[in-house]
Amino acid sequence: MTSPQAPQPTTIDRLAQHVGREVELSGWLANRRSSGKIHFLLVRDGTGTVQAVMSRGDVPAEAFEAADHLPQESSLTLAGTVRADPRAPGGVEVTVRSLCVVHQAEPYPITPKEHGVEFLMDHRHLWIRSRRQHAILRVRAEVIRAMTDYLDGHGYLRVDAPILTPAAVEGTTTLFATAYFDLGPAYLTQSGQLYNEAAAMAFGRVYCFGPTFRAEKSKTRRHLTEFWMLEPEAAFLDLDGYMALAEDFVASVVGRVLERCRVELRALGRDPAPLERVAAPFPRISYDEALRLLAERGKVVAWGDDLGGDEETVISAAFDRPVFVHRYPARCKAFYMQPDPARPEVVLGADLLAPEGYGEI
């Protein structure tokens, strides 16, 4: 006589492969409701969410009683049979045969009511368990994978620039300073560009990707004190070559997210149509042409002034995909930008402006 086979440990994203079989799941209780003789447990494990149905007659009495009082976010392990159900997320649910409470959680502070950002940031370690934050972080992870895969596949070498630096790259007014032993101040990096440029002279094509810090006090969606930035650098790449690389890179990353993150984009309420239009070639206009476009729309900018967020929004609204603005005046760009030999008052550089008012990429 053979002993019954033990339930197979699996994850929620793989349940559709186990319809009709006994499985074991470990996760956290996202929600719970009861109709007296049946508990409906919404369980998540990081890969997805599934409804687990527990009937009084199918499980030991103590397990059924324990489930009746489980607080949200309690951790548990359950075993049961996977059943096909087209109405359920993922097309399956689990009929529970046994339940083990690993840990009973404290009362969960994030309730269905509206909470302020300050409250949610104070509980950030719990907030990331929510459906929306979960989707944001999954999309972010896919963007990072897509970016590094693209550059690795095009012969770029990743180099890691220091986070503590001796000098400013983007101006001294936005530096975070710290004492560096008895050697004077050091600064949190604003950019790895200067290190990248040195590395490009050794390897030809390089990129760095890491945290960046700007001591900007403005509280807008365009200003962050800390963010992660990817910076490629290539030797012997002219302005047209740079723009061709940038548009192919951006289109590739957006296409990858559309391919692999449809579920997350739906969870975020993101209309995919504007993303589907992000395809090369991107429009290219000069700084002078940008000023004329702005003037036609009632925004007059003096020649030589940099373009701000409002101007970038107006320009990007004129196109249905990212747009390059190239050949800015030298006086409004960084010292390391190369002057145009045919017109030394402008530089051989370009900004890529995203549609929908997001501004410079």
Can you name each region flagged by the protein language model?
Residues 2-235:
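Class II aminoacyl-tRNA synthetase-like tRNA-binding/catalytic domains
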Residues 135-139, 273-279:
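Extended, non-catalytic structural segments that build the interaction scaffolds
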Residues 146-154, 249-260:
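Generic non-transmembrane alpha-helical segments
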Residues 158-160, 265-266, 325:
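Cytochrome P450 heme-thiolate monooxygenase catalytic core
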Residues 159, 258-259, 300-303:
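Acidic/polar loop patches that form or flank catalytic/metal-binding clefts of enzymes
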Residues 170, 174-252, 270, 277-361:
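A translation/RNA-centric and nucleic-acid-associated enzymatic feature enriched
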Residues 259-268:
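Flexible, glycine/charged-enriched surface loops at secondary-structure junctions
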